[in-house]
């Protein structure tokens, strides 16, 4: 079990308050007119405890009246002595603690010149002290002689934090650089948690500080009192760039465990970072590893109610698949823990997942064959009913029977996470059946009337048959075929060290994602210039197959138009047919009575052609205006989110700032406030990092993906539009860049 952590350093919280001024109230003499008296001050009683004192720096001090300055110095001395006494520690530093507090406050503020000046003040004030010729004074003088710039910047407060700890806490890069140049100890561990400056850099989720510290000699292998190394800290804060860098520098994520045997997957699952957990599993971290309580990452995802984490863990197959039957030391499975926490959404998901896994005995090929047959029957059965059953009975039968059959099949045989061949088989079989009707019934009668549309029908039919099948096999533009994991890591390190835009990584493919690319969980790959996943071909549409996709769409439209022409010629060849212009209803009833199959397929084809034609035009527009379908969807979601409240009401989103003693500037909260309890009875880790909250679970999150570590947070969706001609040229002749370009050169301006 992960123990409950104690509240963090009070000093780090208290430094955020404004200075307090203590003054003597005006005295009024009895039986005399009230007169305004000047402010008079008197010191607090020597035995009185100072509840709080804001540390004031020299630059702030000079703005105060002289009498305030004198009183503050007295209070600061008392405050420092009071802190030492309360801590119970033996203070042995050569510099008085009141000066240490001021020095660390200046480091927080990041004023390098003031920091330098105060170091000189410390040196001079300690050199000017006259000591007695006794043993104590001689020892003090020896300590004072050892005061150097390096020793001063490594002075610690009573929590063991140095100037560089606080400079990193405030993300002051100039101050951090100055302290490193002056010889700051980068491996010093504070007293409360054993955190090094590198640990705080990972906690603050800033890879630039991690790079700066490690390149200057910080030890990446040091662990704190709970066994967390830098990688485990960065993982809890969803800081993928720091994690990648530390792994490249030699930290093995498979071997990283804290003293409670929690792996990186345990912690990321507990915090709700689904993509980060996926990333570690892809790197080889065992998702079924058990901690000291016997719990896996799956247990913790169910305990905390993170549905995204639970569904992610359930999506792995093969050697990385999770064992849902593992029981913890209390004999409980993850499902039982979810029940005890009343996470009903997760319970429903796991019930559905269990049923899906048992479907067709787990045979996915049989699953696809079943839905392929269902697709063919979806075309044939309604047509047969309308042809051979009176309309008055056929239409109600189709409406009622179709409704119940659809819902039955969807509830019992449909798996949303899998590709499904129902829609592709409907489209392909309908064209195939109509073409057979054309060859057997229509063509022999109308070929001599007008040969041109018949030639078009045959050409477009075979074009559609061949390239439709090819589309289901065609590579949409898999990025991993063009760039390796090793090259991705090299490019990442170069970008991080040079200060360029850091490329995003796919947590599944483990490669850098170029701009406008996306990972598709159904197709299991990252694709360049991702447009959308098409359920009619069970394949993603990307830069490599979009042109072919558009031609297949237009071939279908042309096929339907040509088919309608020859079908109309076929109807007119019947000498018994009524004249259409005289009675549309009578003509329709005549053709429905005598040629029901052909008429129904013609109506179906026209309806499909209208929809597919609209899709084809929209695909052309994505090229002309250089905005993919996925980007259009994201733009709509962004617009919808801006139309909402724009703030949280506390239920769905976690707070983005910390409250009380658990936060302060450090943003590192220890204790049960973010969990539902602590101790063995609660079932929670009892440890959270409150500065940057975990992502909202799927039950409460918005549609827009909020995981900034793995997804672009794009707001300008027109940035790629450079004119129609340039857009077409880019699509046709400059498509290779979509496999490699990770920096968005259009982010700031349109070219």
From Swiss-Prot:
The chain crosses the membrane at residues 385-405, 421-440, 446-469, 548-568, 597-617. It is found in: Membrane. Keywords: Acyltransferase, ANK repeat, Glycoprotein, Lipoprotein, Membrane, Palmitate, Repeat, Transferase, Transmembrane, Transmembrane helix. InterPro entries: Ankyrin_rpt, Ankyrin_rpt-contain_sf, Palmitoyltrfase_DHHC. Glycans are attached at residues 161, 626, 656. Residues 10-40, 690-701 have a biased composition (Low complexity). Residues 660-683 have a biased composition (Gly residues). ANK repeats lie at residues 159-188, 193-222, 226-255, 260-289, 293-322, 330-359. It catalyses: L-cysteinyl-[protein] + hexadecanoyl-CoA = S-hexadecanoyl-L-cysteinyl-[protein] + CoA. It comes from the Eukaryota. The active site is at residue 534. It is a multi-pass membrane protein. GO terms for molecular function: protein-cysteine S-palmitoyltransferase activity. Its EC number is 2.3.1.225. Residues 504-554 form the DHHC domain. It is an enzyme of class 2 (transferase). One of its GO terms (cellular component) is membrane. Residues 1-40, 641-711 are annotated as: Disordered. Palmitoyl acyltransferase. The DHHC domain is required for palmitoyltransferase activity. Belongs to the DHHC palmitoyltransferase family. This is Putative ZDHHC-type palmitoyltransferase 5. It comes from Dictyostelium discoideum (Social amoeba).
């Amino acid at each position: 079990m992960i123990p409950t952590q104690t509240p963090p350093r009070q000093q780090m919280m208290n430094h955020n308050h404004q200075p307090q001024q203590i003054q003597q109230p005006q005295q009024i003499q009895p039986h005399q007119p009230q007169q305004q008296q000047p402010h008079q001050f008197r010191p607090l009683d020597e035995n009185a405890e100072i509840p709080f004192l804001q540390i004031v720096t020299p630059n702030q001090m000079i703005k105060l009246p002289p009498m305030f300055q004198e009183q503050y110095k007295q209070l600061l001395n008392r405050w420092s002595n009071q802190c030492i006494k309360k801590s119970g520690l033996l203070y042995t530093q050569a510099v008085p603690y009141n000066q240490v507090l001021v020095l660390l406050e200046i480091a927080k503020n990041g004023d390098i010149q003031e920091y330098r000046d105060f170091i000189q003040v410390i040196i001079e004030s300690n050199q000017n002290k006259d000591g007695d010729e006794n043993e104590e004074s001689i020892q003090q003088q020896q300590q004072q002689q050892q005061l150097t710039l390096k020793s001063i910047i490594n002075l610690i407060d009573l929590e063991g934090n140095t100037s560089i700890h606080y400079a990193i806490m405030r993300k002051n890069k100039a101050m951090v650089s100055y302290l490193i140049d002056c010889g700051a100890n980068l491996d010093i561990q504070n007293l409360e948690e054993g955190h090094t400056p590198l640990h705080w850099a990972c906690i603050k989720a800033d890879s630039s500080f991690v790079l700066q510290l490690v390149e200057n000699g910080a030890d990446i292998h040091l662990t704190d009192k709970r066994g967390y190394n830098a990688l485990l800290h960065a993982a809890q804060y969803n800081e993928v760039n720091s994690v990648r860098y530390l792994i490249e520098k030699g930290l093995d994520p498979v071997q990283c465990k804290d003293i409670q045997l929690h792996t990186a997957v345990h912690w990321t699952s507990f915090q709700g970072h689904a993509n980060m957990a996926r990333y570690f599993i892809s790197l080889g971290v065992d998702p079924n590893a058990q901690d000291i309580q016997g719990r896996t990452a799956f247990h913790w995802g169910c305990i905390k109610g993170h549905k995204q984490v639970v569904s992610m863990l359930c999506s792995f197959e093969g050697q990385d698949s999770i064992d849902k039957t593992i029981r913890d030391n209390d004999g409980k499975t993850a499902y039982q823990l979810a029940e005890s926490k009343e996470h009903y959404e997760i319970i429903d998901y796991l019930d559905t997942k269990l049923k899906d896994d048992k479907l067709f005995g787990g045979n996915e090929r049989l699953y696809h064959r079943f839905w392929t047959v269902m697709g063919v029957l979806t075309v044939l059965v309604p047509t047969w009913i309308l042809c051979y059953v009176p309309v008055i009975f056929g239409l109600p039968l189709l409406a009622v029977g179709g409704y119940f059959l659809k819902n039955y099949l969807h509830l019992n045989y449909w798996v949303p996470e899998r590709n499904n061949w129902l829609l592709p088989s409907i489209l392909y079989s309908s064209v195939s059946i109509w073409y057979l009707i054309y060859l057997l019934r229509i063509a022999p009668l109308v070929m001599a009337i007008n040969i041109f549309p018949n030639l078009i029908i045959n050409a477009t039919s075979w074009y559609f048959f061949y390239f439709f099948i090819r589309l289901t096999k065609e590579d949409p533009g898999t990025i991993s075929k063009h760039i390796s994991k090793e090259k991705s890591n090299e490019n990442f390190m170069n970008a991080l060290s040079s200060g360029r835009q850091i490329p995003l990584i796919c947590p599944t493919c483990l490669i850098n994602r170029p701009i406008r690319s996306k990972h598709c969980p159904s197709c299991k790959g990252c694709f360049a210039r991702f447009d959308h996943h098409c359920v009619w071909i069970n394949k993603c549409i990307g830069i490599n197959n979009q042109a072919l996709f558009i031609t297949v769409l237009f071939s279908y439209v042309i096929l339907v138009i040509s088919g309608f022409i020859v079908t109309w010629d076929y109807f007119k060849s019947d000498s018994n047919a009524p004249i259409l212009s005289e009675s549309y209803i009578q003509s329709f009833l005549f053709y429905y009575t005598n040629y029901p199959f052909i008429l129904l397929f013609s109506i179906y084809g026209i309806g499909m052609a209208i929809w597919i034609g609209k899709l084809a035009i929209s695909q052309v527009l994505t090229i002309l205006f250089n905005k993919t379908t996925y980007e259009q969807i994201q733009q709509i979601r962004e617009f919808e989110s801006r139309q909402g409240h724009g703030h949280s009401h506390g239920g769905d989103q976690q707070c983005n700032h910390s409250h009380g003693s658990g936060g302060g500037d450090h943003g590192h909260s220890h204790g049960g406030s973010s969990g539902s309890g602590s101790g063995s009875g609660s079932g929670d880790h009892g440890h959270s990092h409150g500065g940057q909250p975990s992502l909202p679970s799927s039950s409460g999150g918005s549609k827009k993906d909020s995981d900034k570590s793995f997804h672009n947070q794009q707001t300008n969706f027109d940035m790629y539009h450079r004119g129609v001609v340039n857009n077409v040229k880019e699509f046709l002749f400059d498509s290779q860049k979509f496999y490699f370009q990770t920096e968005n050169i259009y982010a700031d301006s349109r070219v």
